[in-house]
Regions:
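Short, conserved, GDST-rich strand-edge loop motifs in beta-rich repeat architectures
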Residues: 62-77, 238-251, 291-297, 342-345, ...
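Blade/loop signatures of beta-propeller domains
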Residues: 63-101
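Blade-loop segments of beta-propeller domains
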Residues: 111-120, 134-182
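Structural signature of eukaryotic scaffold interfaces centered on beta-propeller domains
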Residues: 113-126, 161-176, 218-232, 276-282, ...
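Asp-box/WD-like beta-propeller blade repeats and closely related beta-sheet repeat scaffolds
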Residues: 155-244
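Loop/turn-rich, solvent-exposed surfaces of beta-rich toroidal or solenoidal domains
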Residues: 342-352, 362-437
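Blade-level signature of beta-propeller repeat domains, shared across WD40, Kelch, NHL, RCC1
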Residues: 444-487
Length: 487
């Protein structure tokens, strides 16, 4: 049976289908429930920086990365063994399998581990740790140098589900031992901070009193699982909703919170709930992303939601796209915010960037190649490496045989890969790794994400497997100067 296409890739010249969300951990925010309590665990010692790392022996042979858009055949290769560094045979990067889900199932009957989403920054401030979620909704911290698990973020302050499900963990921008998180589904309208060494939780923002001055019956404040604060952690764009019951959370509006000054800086009333909201990396703009069927598509507002939008644009918002697609917001080389997304409605299915300062849209590359199409994820989280975004691709097929596996001889240059694309008028491409994504359900989509300096990446993959049960998480490493090599 052919793998299912569960993302948002339509056949050329047709409309996309929404992604399928299947497990409690993958369901849309308002539908997710807290996982059951888990036994207490003692915190391990902090990860030690500076020691040997998994890919030390391979990294000297990685450069240069394969540049350009020529079709490079992807050879068959066995799935890497657990925690054994492997060099990608076609693209030379270091690939390490950092989970052993099948062994976990055989010995512990525990949920599968997976990288949560491409828009979530999985790596902490110094890339010494990364974060995975299990399919029951608990979050796990791993040592990024060794790949070893460090701790499960449960039983915090005696509460088994304090940080669980849609708690939206965000790493602190400078302190590798801390992360922010929200109440599950934003219920309570607070922002918390966790110290990983002591497992102590502090409330850094109690937004409720100020939000209720605007919307008296608001109960929830969150991004709906797919947004991020600004790169420096100061500004947060969140949606406010009323909580009626498990099946009804009426929308009230969108707002910006200044965590440094602990105050509400702008609000916008809104009746229809967006797919998600996010602050731009600079903190200047709030991006509100609606599905076309339920709202006005994807728009950017300044953080005070005032008119004019900025000194160049007199309207009150910037229309970025007519729909909500797989996308992210990155820094370009000038440290301007760039919305990077795919336009399935365009004639060639273009991946594009839209400058949030200037309103300039630039095509990065087409995806409808020789009557094929595919799905993508975008990660713009390399804030310390401005001007690049990570793209992972999956679910490729031919328009004349949508339910069949695309034969290798029909594959196009982007298919089944992870690559960096530069955010330039004449974009460059650097292919990083083959990701072998046979996708069967939402949980095993790649959801590739990148660290702040574009040296480490995570992705999910069944590695050419026959079912979602083959899904594992892989870490990819490249040298710090990999994107600087001439094309």
């Amino acid at each position: 049976m052919a793998p299912a296409v569960t993302g948002k890739a339509p056949p050329p010249a047709s409309s996309p289908a929404p992604a399928t969300h299947l497990s409690p951990a993958a369901l849309p925010s308002q539908d997710r429930t807290c996982p059951p309590p888990a036994p207490a665990r003692a915190p391990p010692p902090p990860s030690q920086a500076g020691g040997p790392q998994l890919c030390d022996a391979i990294l000297p042979g990685v450069n240069p990365l394969v540049a350009g858009t020529a079709v490079t055949p992807i050879p068959d290769s066995p799935r890497p063994d657990y925690l054994v560094p492997t060099q990608d045979p076609a693209f030379r990067s270091c690939v390490v399998r950092v989970t052993d889900n099948q062994a976990r199932q055989q010995t512990e009957q525990t949920p599968y581990l997976r990288n949560d989403y491409s828009r979530r920054q999985a790596f902490n401030a110094d890339s010494s740790r990364f974060l995975l979620e299990d399919t029951a909704g608990f979050w796990h911290v791993f040592d990024a140098h060794t790949g070893q698990p460090l701790q499960v973020l449960d039983n915090l302050t005696g509460d088994a589900t304090r940080l669980a499900g849609d708690a939206e963990p965000f790493w602190h921008p400078t302190d590798p031992n801390r992360l922010y998180f929200l109440p599950t589904n934003g219920l309570g309208m607070q922002i918390f901070q966790l110290d990983l060494g002591t497992r102590t939780v502090t409330t850094v923002a109690d937004m409720g009193p100020q939000i209720r001055q605007v919307w008296p019956d608001a109960d929830m404040a969150y991004t709906k699982a797919e947004g991020s604060p600004s790169a420096d952690g100061r500004y947060w764009c969140l949606m406010a909703r009323h909580y009626d019951d498990a099946g009804s959370q009426p929308m009230r509006g969108v707002f910006t919170w200044d965590l440094q000054e602990n105050r509400l800086v702008g609000t916008l009333a809104m009746d229809s709930a967006p797919d998600h909201v996010s602050m731009s990396p600079s903190g200047r703009y709030c991006v509100v992303s609606h599905e076309k069927a339920s709202g006005p598509g994807t728009r950017a507002y300044n953080r005070t939601f005032s008119t004019p939008y900025n000194e160049q644009i007199t309207a009150g918002y910037l229309q970025l796209h007519e729909n909500s697609e797989h996308s992210d917001i990155a820094f370009n080389r000038q440290l301007q915010d760039a919305y990077v997304a795919i336009d399935y409605q365009s004639n060639t299915g273009d991946v594009f960037m839209h400058n949030l300062d200037t309103d300039r849209r630039t095509t990065l590359f087409p995806t409808y190649l020789d009557r094929t199409a595919f799905s993508i994820h975008v990660s713009g989280k390399a804030y310390a490496r401005p001007g690049w975004a990570l793209v992972t691709t999956y679910g490729e097929y031919h328009a004349d045989a949508m339910d069949s596996v695309l034969p290798p001889e029909q594959r196009q240059w982007p298919h089944r890969k992870m690559f960096a694309v530069s955010l330039d008028e004449q974009p460059q491409v650097r292919t990083i790794a083959a990701i072998h994504p046979n996708v069967y359900q939402y949980e095993d989509e790649p959801h590739g994400t990148v660290n702040r300096d574009f040296t480490r990446m995570l992705f999910n993959s069944t590695w050419d497997g026959g079912s979602v049960n083959d899904m594992e998480v892989f870490m990819v490493a490249v040298p710090s100067d990999a994107l600087d090599q001439p094309s």
